[in-house]
Amino acid sequence: MKILVVSDTHGYTDKFDVVLEKEQPVDMLIHCGDVERDEDYIRAAAGCPVCMVAGNNDWGSDLQQEIVTEIGKYRVFITHGHRYYVPFEMDRLKAAAKERNAQIVIFGHSHMPYLQEEDGITFLNPGSISKPRQVSFEPTYAIMKLDDLSLIHISEPTR
Protein backbone atom coordinates (compact mmCIF):
# COMPACT_ATOMS: atom_id res chain seq x y z
CA MET A 1 0.00 0.00 0.00
CA LYS A 2 1.42 3.36 -1.06
CA ILE A 3 0.25 6.36 0.98
CA LEU A 4 0.92 9.97 0.02
CA VAL A 5 1.23 12.22 3.08
CA VAL A 6 0.98 16.00 2.74
CA SER A 7 0.27 18.93 5.02
CA ASP A 8 -0.09 22.69 5.02
CA THR A 9 -1.02 23.13 1.36
CA HIS A 10 -2.74 26.44 2.24
CA GLY A 11 -4.89 26.54 -0.89
CA TYR A 12 -2.07 25.93 -3.37
CA THR A 13 -3.78 23.18 -5.36
CA ASP A 14 -1.33 23.59 -8.25
CA LYS A 15 1.51 22.35 -6.05
CA PHE A 16 -0.66 19.52 -4.75
CA ASP A 17 -1.44 18.51 -8.35
CA VAL A 18 2.27 18.34 -9.23
CA VAL A 19 3.00 16.04 -6.28
CA LEU A 20 -0.03 13.86 -6.93
CA GLU A 21 0.87 13.44 -10.61
CA LYS A 22 4.48 12.58 -9.72
CA GLU A 23 3.50 9.91 -7.17
CA GLN A 24 0.48 8.30 -8.85
CA PRO A 25 -0.78 5.72 -8.39
CA VAL A 26 -1.36 6.06 -4.65
CA ASP A 27 -3.66 3.89 -2.56
CA MET A 28 -4.42 6.51 0.07
CA LEU A 29 -3.88 10.20 0.77
CA ILE A 30 -3.36 11.63 4.24
CA HIS A 31 -3.58 15.43 4.59
CA CYS A 32 -2.57 16.83 7.99
CA GLY A 33 -4.49 20.11 7.76
CA ASP A 34 -4.32 23.73 6.71
CA VAL A 35 -6.14 22.79 3.54
CA GLU A 36 -7.85 26.22 3.42
CA ARG A 37 -11.18 25.44 1.78
CA ASP A 38 -9.87 23.00 -0.83
CA GLU A 39 -10.94 19.74 0.82
CA ASP A 40 -13.51 18.90 -1.90
CA TYR A 41 -10.96 19.53 -4.64
CA ILE A 42 -8.33 17.40 -2.90
CA ARG A 43 -10.77 14.52 -2.35
CA ALA A 44 -11.84 14.56 -6.01
CA ALA A 45 -8.29 14.90 -7.38
CA ALA A 46 -6.84 12.14 -5.19
CA GLY A 47 -8.87 9.36 -6.76
CA CYS A 48 -8.34 7.20 -3.67
CA PRO A 49 -9.44 7.10 -0.02
CA VAL A 50 -8.53 10.31 1.82
CA CYS A 51 -7.95 10.98 5.53
CA MET A 52 -7.88 14.71 6.16
CA VAL A 53 -7.91 16.73 9.38
CA ALA A 54 -8.45 20.43 10.08
CA GLY A 55 -5.54 22.72 10.80
CA ASN A 56 -5.42 26.04 12.61
CA ASN A 57 -6.23 27.87 9.34
CA ASP A 58 -9.25 25.74 8.44
CA TRP A 59 -11.88 27.97 10.08
CA GLY A 60 -15.45 26.84 9.58
CA SER A 61 -14.39 23.54 8.06
CA ASP A 62 -16.32 20.35 8.71
CA LEU A 63 -13.05 18.42 8.90
CA GLN A 64 -12.34 16.53 12.11
CA GLN A 65 -9.60 17.87 14.38
CA GLU A 66 -8.06 14.41 14.77
CA ILE A 67 -8.47 10.94 13.31
CA VAL A 68 -7.41 7.62 14.79
CA THR A 69 -7.58 4.86 12.20
CA GLU A 70 -6.20 1.44 11.40
CA ILE A 71 -3.94 1.19 8.35
CA GLY A 72 -2.93 -2.42 7.90
CA LYS A 73 -1.83 -3.64 11.33
CA TYR A 74 -1.00 -0.14 12.54
CA ARG A 75 -3.01 2.20 14.70
CA VAL A 76 -2.44 5.67 13.24
CA PHE A 77 -3.13 9.00 14.94
CA ILE A 78 -3.52 11.92 12.49
CA THR A 79 -3.60 15.51 13.74
CA HIS A 80 -2.47 18.92 12.57
CA GLY A 81 -0.35 19.35 15.69
CA HIS A 82 -1.09 22.94 16.70
CA ARG A 83 -3.05 21.82 19.76
CA TYR A 84 0.08 20.01 20.97
CA TYR A 85 2.46 22.95 20.46
CA VAL A 86 4.60 21.28 17.83
CA PRO A 87 7.34 21.95 16.85
CA PHE A 88 8.25 23.64 20.14
CA GLU A 89 7.69 20.46 22.13
CA MET A 90 6.80 16.86 21.41
CA ASP A 91 5.89 15.64 24.91
CA ARG A 92 2.18 16.48 24.63
CA LEU A 93 1.90 14.84 21.23
CA LYS A 94 3.75 11.77 22.52
CA ALA A 95 1.38 11.55 25.51
CA ALA A 96 -1.66 11.86 23.21
CA ALA A 97 -0.26 9.09 21.00
CA LYS A 98 0.18 6.81 24.00
CA GLU A 99 -3.38 7.57 25.22
CA ARG A 100 -4.67 6.50 21.81
CA ASN A 101 -2.39 3.43 21.62
CA ALA A 102 -1.01 4.78 18.34
CA GLN A 103 2.01 3.20 16.71
CA ILE A 104 2.29 5.96 14.11
CA VAL A 105 1.59 9.68 14.53
CA ILE A 106 1.23 11.84 11.44
CA PHE A 107 1.09 15.59 11.96
CA GLY A 108 1.83 18.92 10.30
CA HIS A 109 1.71 22.58 11.38
CA SER A 110 5.43 23.31 11.53
CA HIS A 111 5.97 23.23 7.74
CA MET A 112 9.20 21.34 8.51
CA PRO A 113 9.74 17.64 7.75
CA TYR A 114 10.28 15.35 10.72
CA LEU A 115 10.73 11.59 11.00
CA GLN A 116 11.62 10.06 14.35
CA GLU A 117 10.87 6.96 16.36
CA GLU A 118 10.47 7.43 20.11
CA ASP A 119 9.30 4.84 22.62
CA GLY A 120 8.16 2.55 19.81
CA ILE A 121 6.04 5.25 18.16
CA THR A 122 6.91 6.62 14.73
CA PHE A 123 6.35 10.38 14.37
CA LEU A 124 6.06 11.76 10.84
CA ASN A 125 5.60 15.33 9.68
CA PRO A 126 5.73 15.60 5.87
CA GLY A 127 6.58 19.30 5.94
CA SER A 128 4.85 21.55 3.41
CA ILE A 129 4.67 21.50 -0.38
CA SER A 130 3.56 25.14 -0.50
CA LYS A 131 5.24 27.08 2.31
CA PRO A 132 8.29 25.19 3.63
CA ARG A 133 10.08 26.64 6.66
CA GLN A 134 13.12 24.41 7.15
CA VAL A 135 16.56 25.87 6.43
CA SER A 136 16.58 24.77 2.78
CA PHE A 137 13.03 26.06 2.13
CA GLU A 138 12.48 23.08 -0.19
CA PRO A 139 8.90 21.81 -0.55
CA THR A 140 8.48 18.38 1.07
CA TYR A 141 5.99 15.56 1.41
CA ALA A 142 6.25 11.91 2.47
CA ILE A 143 5.47 8.49 1.03
CA MET A 144 4.53 5.68 3.41
CA LYS A 145 4.53 2.10 2.14
CA LEU A 146 3.06 -0.97 3.80
CA ASP A 147 4.37 -4.15 2.28
CA ASP A 148 2.95 -7.66 2.22
CA LEU A 149 4.66 -8.44 5.51
CA SER A 150 2.82 -5.54 7.16
CA LEU A 151 6.12 -3.78 7.79
CA ILE A 152 6.08 -0.04 7.44
CA HIS A 153 8.66 1.82 5.45
CA ILE A 154 8.55 5.59 5.62
CA SER A 155 10.76 7.35 3.16
CA GLU A 156 12.44 10.55 4.16
CA PRO A 157 10.21 13.43 3.15
CA THR A 158 11.14 14.39 -0.38
CA ARG A 159 10.70 17.34 -2.64
Model-derived segments and their meaning:
Residues V5-S7, M28-G33, C51-N56, F77-H80, ...:
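Active-site neighborhood of phospho(di)ester-bond hydrolases with catalytic His/Asp-centered motifs
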Residues G11, R37, R83, M112, ...:
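Short active-site segment of divalent metal-dependent hydrolases/proteases
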